[in-house]
Amino acid sequence: MNNAVGYAKPTERSNKILLGTDGIGADMIEEARIAYARLREFNVSAEPTTVWQWLENSLELFPDAKQDVVSFDYDFADSPWHAAFTTNMNVTDVEIAGEKVLTNSQPTRVDLQEVRAKANEQALRLYERLS
């Protein structure tokens, strides 16, 4: 839906559907919530379980992800129905292949202050070149 790519009415085709993101948002629960709302535009009887299956189908591309652990600040984030009707469910912790990469909503592998400082330096440098 971003970048004016449109909406393909995915349930009208027989091929397997996977829900993903092009990186602009990268919030897959929010993408699923929006996909469910869009699905209901042309099928009012559609259920969130359809879209949830699209999320699960993506695990076929990344089977190792089945072992990863993702925790949310909402107790029922693993429910298709709750995910479809609840906004602002935030990831709090992520463990990938036994390594904690997000703890208390903060990355563990990078220093955010350093990343932001370097990004600011580069933005100023670019601005100077463009001026």
What label would you give each PLM region?
Residues 37, 53-131:
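Active-site microenvironment of metallo-dependent hydrolases
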Residues 1-77, 85-86:
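Active-site-adjacent C-terminal substructures of enzyme catalytic domains
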